Amino acid sequence: MAKIVVIGAGVAGLTTALQLLRKGHEVTIVSEFTPGDLSIGYTSPWAGANWLTFYDGGKLADYDAVSYPILRELARSSPEAGIRLISQRSHVLKRDLPKLEVAMSAICQRNPWFKNTVDSFEIIEDRSRIVHDDVAYLVEFRSVCIHTGVYLNWLMSQCLSLGATVVKRRVNHIKDANLLHSSGSRPDVIVNCSGLFARFLGGVEDKKMYPIRGQVVLVRNSLPFMASFSSTPEKENEDEALYIMTRFDGTSIIGGCFQPNNWSSEPDPSLTHRILSRALDRFPELTKDGPLDIVRECVGHRPGREGGPRVELEKIPGVGFVVHNYGAAGAGYQSSYGMADEAVSYVERALTRPNL
């Protein structure tokens, strides 16, 4: 089979590598960072993560649709992957109804595209089941919560078990990957899963890439479900949100914010205060067994891209075939298998049509 170099060992790179390995290809993963590293340059460990699609349809929704049943099955059959099946409750505030009628995110719709994709989908309007007076209705369904540190290690272990090799180094130019396949031979295809670094990677330098700063708090407190809200109480903080992701180990991720073009890597104490205050105001039961037990404040840079993610085949002069798979913004985990499968299809196209 073909010799492939995958640049990047985040969720996109590892998922794509895994799908290529399952087809019998010889894969070398090249990355400055690998699971276990905690660097602001390595986005994937800082994510929540869950399956909570916010696209209204089209290709981006298709990526999420492909990933849902795979993640659900992993939660059921492979507990070592760190994925938990758990209910997701999206709270739609009464005050947001007018604007939602104009621009309604999929997670707040009464009749979203994914209602027949997920398990146990339900619109809850019965006031006896809605705790908060300012909530118009709930969108509830069976979702997954991914412990990202555990899952990234699981992905890497799966890749290694199928024969992948790993080269831990920074790639400064896309052409350098031609010298890095473990066989010593030039790879047939390079797969670029460099995430936000695609902005700086020589030979790519995608200036459409930009950071979307996120800040969350990891705590040893939990709810029996996951939660999100259509907006926060303060009108002046429109780039902030309230969401709680409940992991299998009893910890929770409480967030957060979506701050485009913010490269800051340091936690903002005032934002941490707002995040926790909102969570406790909405869910005082978080502290039923004791006060909030904070593990750490986390900051990450989601790989945003103008026009959406890039999944495509390119033939670069002097380099060869490159398949790009990056720029999923905040949807990296929930879109991972859909985007990886499309990337694999482009690899196969390059292999079968070398004169493109």
Curated annotation (Swiss-Prot):
Predominant localisation class: other
Organism the protein comes from: Trigonopsis variabilis (Yeast)
Binding site for anthranilate 2: F54
Single GO biological process annotation from the record: D-amino acid catabolic process
This protein's record includes keyword Oxidoreductase: yes
Effect of P291S: Loss of activity
Root EC class: oxidoreductase
Cofactors demanded by this protein: FAD
Protein's UniProt name: D-amino-acid oxidase
